[in-house]
Amino acid sequence: MKKATKLLLSILPISSISFLSVVSCSTRNSNAKQPDKKPEKPNEKGPIIPKNPDNKKPTNNNNNSNNNSNSNNNKPGSTVPNENKDPSKSEETPEKPERDPKKPDKQPQGDDPNNHQPHNNQHADQPNINKDEFADLDKLPKEISFERFDFYTSKDATTALSHLRTDGSVIKIIFSNTHRNIFGKYNINLELDGNEKEDVKKGLIDKVKVKFTNKKDKKSKIIEFTFTGFKVIQKSPDKENKNSKKNYIKKKEKIDNKLTGLYPSLVAYMIMYTQEPKNYKNLMQKDSINFEELENNNPNLFADPEINLNVVALKDLLLEYNRELGKLYKDKVIAVSYDDVNGKLGLKLLIENREENDTIASKYSETLEFDFVGFRKIDLKNPNKNVLSLLFPQNNFKDMIKNNVFKKKIEVLKSGKQKEDMVLVKEEYAKQLIFKNLLVQIIDNENNLYRSTQTLSLQNNKKDNYTSILGLAGGGTLYPFHTIINNNSIKNIYLMINKEKNKKYKVAINFEVDIPIFASTTSDLTFHATSGDTNILKLDITTNALID
């Protein structure tokens, strides 16, 4: 047999012998990855050749060829290609020696470009550092059952959703019991945005968003689920039934001017807050014009003493109630929408049986939606016609330009070293200085509803007793309408200088404040969500001061 082998080697071309060397190396690397076999020492024995009934141990000549190949390929993680390898020829991977020869190892081996196994002696079960952080969430079932909660199984989907809006703690209970690893890793909260779809006939709520926030790095992901297990209701037409829930409430055809003279965003927020104050505590900023300042009639903010921004008074101005059916039913506003550009307000109400009413009325709850038009609009083309304006007092400006951010630029302008007599101010700190010096003006010549008897500002100033209108977290306002104003709202700051006859200089500043005007989705407004494009109200502000 040895003679036959030597004869074979003498006949074969060199490329074929190199091929045998590569096969040997691949087999050795494969062996090294078997946890139940002790790896061979490279210099102790020759390479292992897969067993074949017609083959025996190769000769020393072949051994030397293999050892030369091993000098590169036997190194862990080596990516050095075999120079003698002919890429045009297909290569068949030898079977991996195992206890059962009938089960070949089909995984790519060695430095095969298709090999996705760990290199550098990394074990196959070692965690992948590039693994998706939220991979465990992607494996969650997309249906969550409420069948084990008697409170919810006795409620139809619409009623259940209403309760979830006020108390979403049940989702934590569910995950703490069914997915403890997820509960331990993430903070879990409902993110109800008004886009949920209730189906009382199937007893489910679709498109429910749940937010998972990693407790360590605070990264979060929102996933949509379908909640199931609620009471199934087969509705029957009840248009002819005088006791129908649909007959309980209707919208008024004409709304009092003292309400439509307000911006719809203010009305929407106050309806939701005064109905469930605890749900909006985290949105409030203290020592500013917030929910509490607006809840009851505030003569410092409104000229009409009859304006009362609580849910009972507001619903009475918007809706007509059948008082007889009021003995059977109760109602609750579960979502609102507003559009300050077009003066629109939307209400979504849930109508339920009163506890004592269990015989006369049908068992299912009903949702009614109403849209109102004719509310006050933001005039984007004529900013001066709006209730809100901003003022930069001269004294504030004169003090501000003593700061080095402005002082250095003024000196350059005075020196005449640059051709133009104005300069663009780009420093972020300049925006901060301007922001804290701006005052708010509330003037309502059209309807005489809004008014301010106190000095308002964007930033609280206890020294001068200024009160900020930013009553919502994140720089949000409620009064006179909902918007968001911060340092980044200030744009295009230009500083100008002119020499006066009395050897003084007139320094002027001009800039814009971009105020976003929103149209919301239908939601409970516990978070900020808009629909469509945001419109921008641009306020142009100029002031000046004389300096030496």
From Swiss-Prot:
Write down the InterPro entries for this protein, in alphabetical order.
Answer: Mycoides_lipoprot_LppA/p72
Query: Biased-composition ranges for Basic and acidic residues?
Result: 34-44, 83-109
The lipid modification N-palmitoyl cysteine is placed on: 25
- Biased composition (Low complexity) is annotated at 58-78, 110-128
Q: Which GO terms describe its cellular component?
A: plasma membrane
Q: Where is the lipid attached (S-diacylglycerol cysteine)?
A: 25
Membrane keyword on record: yes
> Would the keyword Cell membrane turn up in this protein's UniProt record?
yes
What UniProt keywords are attached to this protein's entry? Cell membrane, Lipoprotein, Membrane, Palmitate, Signal
Q: Which residues form the signal peptide?
A: 1-24
Tree of life domain: Bacteria
Coiled-coil parts of chain:
none
Q: How does it sit in the membrane?
A: Lipid-anchor
Region annotation (Disordered) ranges: 26-129
Compartments, as annotated in UniProt: Cell membrane
Predominant localisation class: membrane
Membership in a protein family: Belongs to the mycoplasma p72 lipoprotein family.
| Protein name in UniProt | Uncharacterized lipoprotein lpp
| Organism from which the protein derives | Mycoplasma mycoides subsp. mycoides SC (strain CCUG 32753 / NCTC 10114 / PG1)
